[in-house]
C-alpha cells in the first residue's frame, strides 16, 4: 500500500504539456482536446512561465463572445488569434514542497482549477482539481 500523498510533488502531474505564447489558439484547442487537458501553461521563448489558458478561456475568449456567430466563426477566430491574446498572465503557482492541504486551500480561495508547480523558475508540474478527485476516489 502506498503512503498517502502529503506534498504537491506527491500528487502533481510532472510531465506538463506547455505551449509557446505565439502559437495560434487553434493549436491550443487541438492540444487540449486531443490530450484531454483543461489547463495549458504558456511559456516564453526561454521556457519561463508566461501565462495559462484553460478550456474556458478558449470558449469565452472576448472576441468570440462579442461576435457570437457560432462554431464556424469560432473556428476562424481560433486560427487568427495567438495564445497570448487569450491567456491569463496572472498565474497562481506553488512549489513541489508545499503541503497538499495548503495547495487545496489556495485553489479554493482563488477559485481556480489548477496550480502550476514551479521549482525555481522551471515548470515542475501541474496540480489540478482532478488530481484531488482521483486522490479521494482511490481512498
Walk through the language-model features, giving the residues of each:
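Short hydrophobic beta-strand motif reused across regulatory alpha/beta modules
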Residues: 38, 51-59, 113, 118, ...
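The conserved cystathionine-beta-synthase
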Residues: 19-36, 42-44, 93-111, 117-118, ...
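Residue-level recognition of oxygen-bearing side chains
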Residues: 24, 58, 99, 122, ...
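Tandem CBS (Bateman) regulatory domains
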Residues: 1-15, 54-91, 104-108, 128-139
